[in-house]
Amino acid sequence: MWVFFINFAKNLEDSKFHDIILGKWSEHMKKNKTNISKLLLTLAIALFLGIATYFNIDLEGLLNSSNAYNKINYTASFDLTTIPKFENEPYVVLNDNKPDFNEEDFARDTFEDYSPLDYLGRCGPAFAKVGIETMPTEERGAINSVKPSGWQTVKYDIVEGKYLYNRCHLIGYQLTAENANEKNLITGTRYMNVQGMLPFENMVAEYVRTTKNHVLYRVTPIFENDNLVASGVEIEAQSVENKGEGICFNVYVYNVQPGIDINYKNGESTLN
């Protein structure tokens, strides 16, 4: 960073640059305080942009990171406080099981949209029009290089497979062939992954393979405040060609593991 300021100081020694800056400053000093404030703000912005450019800072990412969901123009249509407390069922139905897609979604050609990670490194919604053409043609590869927000490697004997957390695909690999995509992987319990999400993924995959039709499929991770681990995910799906006669659901899947208490702030856990 010092190199940048040294170069900036050297530029000030250049007579033309020096005269311009001093001239502008002198001119504005003669005006009222509002104009002086505007000049200071302009100089501050220029300096900030210069530093950002010099150090290759992703300004767009910083500006958009507080709400990555806007990238695919969707936020969950419910308040987390309205979701019933987990009662040994992996999911609850939302909005009378009706997804919240619009006509533009149905009209789009086959697509896959993944939100950029937000300023905490968290995933946003993942949205796709699933069809035979989006499904994998090879076995899934390794995904252990991805460390989703809140990731903890911890084992419990009461968990099938021992590991509490899985790297959960928002849109399952069998639907869109996305492997180690950090924008499509969250920290999820084994229970949510296998008991909660997988049955819905299998339902959609079987429908697409059997009918060769398409399905709109969107998964939205629900984070409370600045928690790094999602409280759950909203899964919406609707068959395209018959407007939901084949597949139609909207559910909230709990990111829980029976017998274990989870700190959603950072992913830490204890036996309850």
Per-segment meaning from a language model:
Residues 53-64, 235-238:
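Hydrophobic single-pass membrane-insertion segments
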Residues 30-42:
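N-terminal Sec-pathway targeting helices
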Residues 3-6, 267-268:
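Folded, non-transmembrane soluble domains that reside on the lumenal/extracytoplasmic side of membranes
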Residues 59-110:
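N-terminal, intrinsically disordered, polar/charged segments of Gram-positive cell-envelope systems
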Residues 7-10, 14-16, 20:
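Short, positively charged and aromatic/hydrophobic N-terminal segments
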Residues 40-54:
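Hydrophobic membrane-insertion alpha-helices, especially the h-region
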Residues 103-272:
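Domain-level detector of nuclease and nuclease-like folds
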